[in-house]
Amino acid sequence: LYTDSTHLKANANKRHYEQVEVEQTPAAYLAELDAAVDAERAAAGQRPLRRAQAAPAGPSDAGPTPEPGAHGAPAAPSEPTSEAAAADTRQIKRSTVDPEAGFMVRDQKPVGFFYLDHRTVDGVHALIVDTHVTPGNVNDATPYLERLDRARTRFDLKVGAVGLDAGYFTPWVCKGIVERGLYGVMGYRRPSHREGYFHKREYAYDPQTDSYRCPAGQIIVYRGTNRMGYREYASDPAQCRQCPQRARCTQSQNHQKRITRHLWQHFKEQIDAHRLTDLGKRLYAPRKETVERSFADAKELHGHRYARFRGLAKVQAQCLLSAACQNMKKIALLLARRAAALFSPKFWLCGALAGSLRSLYPLLTPRSPAGPSRYPAFPIV
């Protein structure tokens, strides 16, 4: 299955909006992340974190992002929330024309009020198996696992692999794919890097000692796990102060290098390793011919660039209707090709050749002296 999202311009002027305070709903995965953080800190002999109490978890408006710290804050196991993501509120732009549209701000994308159509297609015929609409300010990775499970159960699909772009490369999504026994292949996004400094990949991680080794050879040891789900590693300031490579490593006033590593980083590394294999390259290549082509046909032939209605439910109906039309056209074309193959000259030529071989088979079969052939003769067609 291949999944991606595209934006539909909402029927709302981007200049007609109001600034409102909305409560940040914690993401659904925070309860599981909190349990992992508590277990990690307990194993290291650290005290448990104090967390605020708030409403039950639900899909986050912003969703997780691939960069560290974008998951929001962890929550308590009983109430999946946290101090950083629970009781806090954030200010957003809400359209006065279509309040359910989301104000989208993305790199190399138009700015304004949009809806997002999250679409999943199969890798054989590019038939649409799921389409889901969210406001434009929702991250692509937020509804992915829920929609993947729905598509698999709704049509009883025997899915073996999934292909996604780099926007879905988050620890939570990678963990969900691995735990579902799927072979995930995701695109690559070059990480941000400050000119003149070492890349993070130059710091080698040793899983045996749970530590990093810097390019100068110093060991960066584990210091603790924060409430965001990141393990923190810190160097020895006494050694870094005299290091000749310190200018390329850190500019902190206490001469200490800090590195963070997510608790579920090994899931990301496992998924990222698939991208470099021959199987991963073959699986990822049809993505542009399936889900990307599906969006292209929808925009060119079905008016999928603009939301024709206002409100999330009506835009969802528009996307479902567009997906149904595309599926009916594709199924009709596939059935027509199959019917044409039955009446093609190649089909009848192969049939005539098979009939001739069946006719010649008794003549070429050796007969025993006793009389009839030892092999049954095929009827002449």
Briefly describe each language-model feature range.
Residues 1-381:
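Anion-binding and metal-coordination hotspots
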